[in-house]
Amino acid sequence: MGKIPIKRILAIDYGKKRTGLAKTDPFCSFAQPVGTFPPEKIITIIKSFLQENSVEKIIVGYPLNSDGTKNPMTGIIDGFIEELSAAFPDIPVEPIDEHGSSKQAGKVLIESGLSRKKRQRKGRLDSAAACLLLQHYLENTGNA
């Protein structure tokens, strides 16, 4: 009997300085951090990730203002989504509203009991934000 391929969802919290990645567990039930990486290396990092993991979808945090309008970062993300779609044409890329995800991730890190010094490592915040984006996505699509 053949092995059933396990497909994951990959979430990206793209930033100018750091980009957080998160993935689902093998059953697409909950989010797990992958790490934080320099944005200029993220396509290479994802290619490496895909060599070891089957991904059915990539979701990207999409920065909108609280009133739903676009902001300067939205254009950067639009370009990044085009780059992702070109690099991985067989994997759908879906933008999802990320409004407040970094702020919420900061609160989660505080509640987790991490010391202020450890919380201030920005990489933790970016990967936590990617996890929150993904968990929110899973809950809203009925996967969690």
Swiss-Prot record:
EC numbers on record: 3.1.-.-
Main subcellular localisation: cytoplasm
Stored Pfam families: RuvX (PF03652)
Keyword Hydrolase: yes
A single BP term in Gene Ontology: rRNA 5'-end processing
Listed SMART domains: YqgFc (SM00732)
Gene3D superfamilies per the UniProt record, alphabetical: YqgF/RNase H-like domain
SUPFAM superfamilies for the chain: Ribonuclease H-like
MF terms in GO: nuclease activity
Cellular localisation: Cytoplasm
Top-rank taxon: Bacteria
Alphabetic keyword roster: Cytoplasm, Hydrolase, Nuclease, Ribosome biogenesis
GO annotation, cellular component aspect: cytosol
Catalytic class of the enzyme: hydrolase
HAMAP family: Nuclease_YqgF
Function statement: Could be a nuclease involved in processing of the 5'-end of pre-16S rRNA.
Similarity remark: Belongs to the YqgF nuclease family.
Name of the protein this chain belongs to: Putative pre-16S rRNA nuclease
Species whose genome carries this gene: Chlorobium phaeobacteroides (strain BS1)
The organism's taxonomic lineage, starting at the top: Bacteria, Pseudomonadati, Chlorobiota, Chlorobiia, Chlorobiales
